[in-house]
């Protein structure tokens, strides 16, 4: 009996030993200091307060390349929200993240720096430490300073393909620094892909989804409440737009922080906001484009025409305009758009009011936030190049002035009754005013 007992004990020990070798347990820490490190072999990770996010090493299913990234710790479907070395992976399983000389570096087996924060400053009397915050932000700070304004470095300033609540996409008009999202190469390759989602300041800041030089989607300008072409549901989340000190920025906040939510650029070329459903253990799509509707596609209809969802012909000419090529228009080829029935004369010109619109592209627009709609109308009539005008901000009955001086492109009409859409006033010759 004793012999059998000993054999069982030995077999159990060997089984546990081999399991630990094949599947090493993950050890977590909350703060990384200069006396600690994360290595691939130790399977050690850095965890945020509340165990929401986790930072560590990972590799893709189809390769032996290793990356340093952040993912949701409690989400069963491993979902990465940030990758430090997405375009410079480790080629072997020997890698270390450590703080060295007040600078956390990601090193491969030959002590060559694969990724670094490039941080050179720090308070020698207060050692530098690194944390993953509850919102998923990986930060470096002096050990005696927890204030956000004192962060020495943060991953939120270097987004990859995902926007988290409180994370900003921004454009600095002074330095030209643009923080934007870039898609993955594929579902199993986190390197930089073909699609980007960025804020273009132009006359009125707007978001563009693009693939190289090709524009795929335009959000519409900020109307004081939201970007006119972006869905917004105050029950789940709401948008925040910041414009100050030569810098424009956008972020979203959750109305209930117990929900996990993310906005990301897909490797297949669309923008999607998802929320995690713990009951079904699945990500639910809150909205996605340009998949939701053909009207989301950039310039789905040509000049001086607008897109309408759920109609037999999605493209319609503005009042006072006719298809530039009737035969193509009848064949549902709308790229040529529409042309005026009557040329503008400057004398007797007026306007047709188009309600609930996504404003046309603002590349050639003139913006004056100091005047109202009446003065805006006068300025448009006095400018022979003016083709349309609108309020810049729909709050408080409408303020500011946007004057379009080029062709009206990429417009869309929304459902009647929308409370946060804009009206567009298109200039017409007297003969075409109804």
From Swiss-Prot:
Involved in sporophytic self-incompatibility system (the inability of flowering plants to achieve self-fertilization). The lineage of its organism: Eukaryota, Viridiplantae, Streptophyta, Embryophyta, Tracheophyta. This is S-locus-specific glycoprotein S14. SMART domains: B_lectin, PAN_AP. The keyword Amino-acid biosynthesis does not apply. Residues 338-429 form the PAN domain. The keyword Glycoprotein applies. Residues 1-28 form the signal peptide. PROSITE patterns: BULB_LECTIN (PS50927), PAN (PS50948). Stigma.
């Amino acid at each position: 009996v004793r012999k059998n007992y000993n054999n069982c004990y030995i077999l159990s020990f060997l089984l546990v030993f081999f399991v630990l070798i094949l599947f090493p347990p993950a050890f977590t820490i909350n703060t990384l200091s200069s006396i600690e490190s994360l290595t691939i072999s130790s399977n050690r990770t850095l965890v945020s307060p509340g165990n929401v996010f986790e930072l560590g090493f990972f590799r893709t299913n189809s390769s032996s390349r290793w990356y340093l990234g952040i993912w949701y710790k409690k989400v069963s479907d491993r979902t990465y929200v940030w990758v430090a070395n997405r375009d410079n992976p480790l080629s072997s399983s020997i890698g270390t993240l450590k703080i060295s000389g007040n600078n956390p570096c990601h090193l491969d087996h030959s002590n060559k720096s694969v990724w670094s924060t490039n941080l050179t400053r720090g308070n020698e009397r207060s050692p530098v430490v690194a944390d993953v915050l509850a919102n998923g932000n990986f930060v470096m700070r002096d050990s005696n300073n927890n204030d956000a304004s004192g962060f020495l470095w943060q991953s939120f300033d270097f987004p990859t393909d995902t926007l988290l609540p409180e994370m900003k996409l921004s454009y600095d008009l002074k330095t030209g620094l643009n923080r934007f999202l870039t898609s993955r190469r594929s579902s199993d390759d986190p390197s930089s892909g073909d699609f980007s989602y960025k804020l273009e300041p132009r006359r009125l800041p707007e978001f563009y989804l693009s693939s190289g030089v090709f524009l795929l989607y335009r959000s519409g300008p900020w109307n004081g409440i939201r970007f006119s072409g972006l869905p917004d549901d105050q029950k789940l989340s709401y948008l925040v737009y910041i414009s100050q000190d030569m810098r424009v920025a956008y972020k979203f906040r959750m109305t209930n922080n117990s929900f996990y939510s993310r906005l990301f650029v897909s490797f297949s070329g669309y923008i999607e906001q998802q929320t995690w459903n713990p009951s079904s253990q699945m990500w639910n799509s809150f909205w996605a484009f340009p998949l939701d509707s053909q009207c989301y596609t950039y310039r789905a209809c040509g000049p001086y025409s607008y897109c309408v969802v759920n109609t037999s012909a999605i493209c319609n000419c503005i009042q006072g305009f006719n298809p530039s090529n009737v035969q193509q228009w009848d064949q549902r080829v709308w790229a040529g758009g529409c042309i005026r029935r009557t040329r503008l004369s400057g004398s007797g010109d007026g306007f047709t009011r188009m309600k609930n619109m996504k404003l046309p592209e603002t590349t050639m627009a003139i913006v004056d936030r100091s005047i109202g709609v009446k003065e805006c109308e006068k300025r448009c009539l006095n400018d022979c190049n003016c083709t349309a005008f609108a309020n810049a901000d729909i709050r408080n009955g409408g303020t500011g002035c946007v004057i379009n001086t080029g062709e009206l492109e990429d417009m869309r009409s929304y459902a009647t009754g929308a409370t946060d859409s804009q009206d567009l006033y298109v200039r017409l010759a007297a003969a075409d005013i109804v």
